[in-house]
Every structure is written in structure tokens, then in C-alpha cells.
């Protein structure tokens, strides 16, 4: 397993692989690896002969009040885990991703609007910029992104499509604990009481999704009823011990345009005609996703389920 600490080293390794016709798959991470990350390597190994895992805590996607300085950094443990898989051919862990005087950023629209961007307006510009850099600095042909960060996945897919980047984005299913909690590096922040309450977010999403599916089968969906279902899910999350819910949103799965319900208050940037069109086709739309973000103590958890 090669360890590359700068762009030149990484590109030299990738060039050697490409010269022999090997397909390179990238698994981008910020470290503090868990079984969810390892599952991405398993998928990457199915799609290419060579797998690169990047480890880089990207400062551009953290606001000043967020947890950049305290974000878990477990480099040696991460390297040990990657080596143990036997699936990682190179680790790209640059000291910095940006040249001195770097002043260019990618600012995505479309799928980046609403949801996470309401409380984290800086986030997707930071994500899109660093992911673009990773694609360039690894010369990968494919990249694996988890569906747990569903909006992020859609933003990256949109960027690749809009900029004709020529890299294939492969979605990977969310990996969960036995009680349903989606694996996340930030789960390590949870104390015992918070950890016991945390699965309520997924449980509420599941129950809401079941109600939405049943409603659609019965009468094609009713906006007031959908709003009630989402409000009930939000109340269940709060009752379980979460302090607040940033959003509980029903969206079209492809472009993440809001469909209807409690997420309407987060859709003010979307054109009114788009929202009306989405509502008209909501009943017949098989591809919808229910997304949520909620805070328990100082920890913010996100999750989603398909509807």
C-alpha cells in the first residue's frame, strides 16, 4: 500500500497504473474511518483494478464555529484499517490541497440549494472545490460516494455532469448499526445517553416513509396529509431527546427539488413554478427521498430514506 503525501507523488503512481490500462477508483474520506468507509473500498474494488483512499480534513467545508479543529484525526489507526482490508493500493493524504494564493472555488447551485445549505451555506462550495481537486490530483476514473450524505452525492454528480469531468460517480448504500443508526465519524462524539437516543432519527424517517408510501397508494397523496406525516416524524425525533430538527424534507430523488410538506420553509430559493410542478407529479413519482438533519446536544446527525 503506497502512501502519497503530495500531488506529484500521487499523479506519478496513477500514471504508472494508467499506463498498464488499470482503472483507478477513488474513495474520498476525511479519515476517522469506520465500517461504512470500508464498505466503500469493497465497492471500489469491484469497479477497478486500483483503489485510492484519500484522507484529508478539508478546512473549506467548515464554518468558523464548526468542529474543524476537534474533528477526529486518527491517521495511524486509519492506515492500519486500510492495510488490513487488502483492497487499498494507495493512500493520498496531502498536507494541503490548495496552492499558496488559491482563490478559486466551485459554487454549486441546483441540488446544493436548501436542506444542508440553509444552516451550512458555506458547505457545498467547500465540498465541491475539494472534490474537484481530488479528482484532478488523483487522476481517478471512478469515485465512490455514500448515499448517507445524499445531498452531497447529488451535488457531486451534478458537478461532474455540468463540468463534463469524465469521471464516473458510483453511489454506495448507507451502512448502519444494528439499531439503525447510520455510521458516521461524528457518532464518536455521542455520549451513552445520546447514543441510545440517536437511532430515533432513522426510526422516524422509516415510519414517515411508510406513511407516505401508503398515502400514495391509497389516494395519490394529499399535501396536508403529507405535511402532517412529516410533522409527526419531526415531533417523534424531538420526543426521543433531540434538541432541534434542522429539516425534515420530502424531495425528488434526482434533483432534490422539494415535493411538499414541512420542507417548504426551506425551499424559498426555488422557483415557485418548479415547486408547483413537483407537487403535481408527486403522486406518480416513484423516486422520492425523505431527508432529515437534527441536533442532539452539540452533535448534528443527518439521515435519509427512499420513499
Language-model features: locations:
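Nucleotidyltransferase catalytic core that binds NTPs
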Residues: 2-242, 263, 298
Amino acid at each position: 500500500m503506497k502512501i502519497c503525501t503530495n500531488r506529484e507523488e500521487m499523479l506519478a503512481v496513477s500514471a504508472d497504473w494508467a499506463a498498464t490500462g488499470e482503472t483507478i477508483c477513488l474513495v474520498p474520506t476525511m479519515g476517522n474511518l469506520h465500517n461504512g468507509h470500508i464498505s466503500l473500498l469493497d465497492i471500489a474494488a469491484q469497479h477497478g483494478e486500483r483503489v485510492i483512499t484519500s484522507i484529508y480534513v478539508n478546512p473549506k467545508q467548515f464554518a468558523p464555529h464548526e468542529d474543524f479543529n476537534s474533528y477526529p484525526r486518527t491517521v495511524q489507526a486509519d492506515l492500519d484499517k486500510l492495510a488490513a482490508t487488502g483492497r487499498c493500493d494507495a493512500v493520498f493524504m496531502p498536507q494541503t490541497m490548495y496552492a499558496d494564493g488559491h482563490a478559486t472555488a466551485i459554487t454549486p447551485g441546483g441540488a446544493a440549494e436548501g436542506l444542508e445549505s440553509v444552516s451550512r451555506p458555506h458547505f457545498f462550495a467547500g465540498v465541491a472545490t475539494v472534490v474537484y481537486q481530488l479528482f484532478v490530483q488523483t487522476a481517478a476514473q471512478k469515485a465512490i460516494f455514500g448515499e448517507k450524505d445524499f445531498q452531497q452525492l447529488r451535488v457531486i454528480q451534478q458537478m461532474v455532469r455540468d463540468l463534463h469531468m469524465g469521471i464516473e460517480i458510483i453511489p454506495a448504500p448507507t451502512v448502519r448499526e444494528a439499531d439503525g443508526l447510520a455510521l458516521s465519524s461524528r457518532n464518536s462524539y455521542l455520549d451513552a445517553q445520546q447514543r441510545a437516543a440517536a437511532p430515533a432519527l432513522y426510526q422516524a424517517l422509516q415510519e414517515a416513509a411508510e406513511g407516505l408510501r401508503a398515502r400514495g397508494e391509497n389516494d395519490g397523496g394529499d399535501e396536508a396529509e403529507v405535511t402532517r406525516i412529516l410533522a409527526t416524524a419531526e415531533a417523534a425525533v424531538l420526543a426521543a431527546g433531540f434538541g432541534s430538527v434542522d429539516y425534515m424534507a420530502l424531495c425528488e430523488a434526482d434533483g432534490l427539488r422539494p415535493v411538499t410538506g414541512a420542507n417548504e420553509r426551506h425551499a424559498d430559493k426555488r422557483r415557485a413554478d418548479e415547486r408547483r410542478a413537483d407537487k403535481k407529479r408527486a403522486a406518480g413519482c416513484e423516486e422520492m427521498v425523505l431527508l432529515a438533519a437534527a441536533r442532539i446536544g452539540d452533535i448534528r446527525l443527518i439521515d435519509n430514506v427512499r420513499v
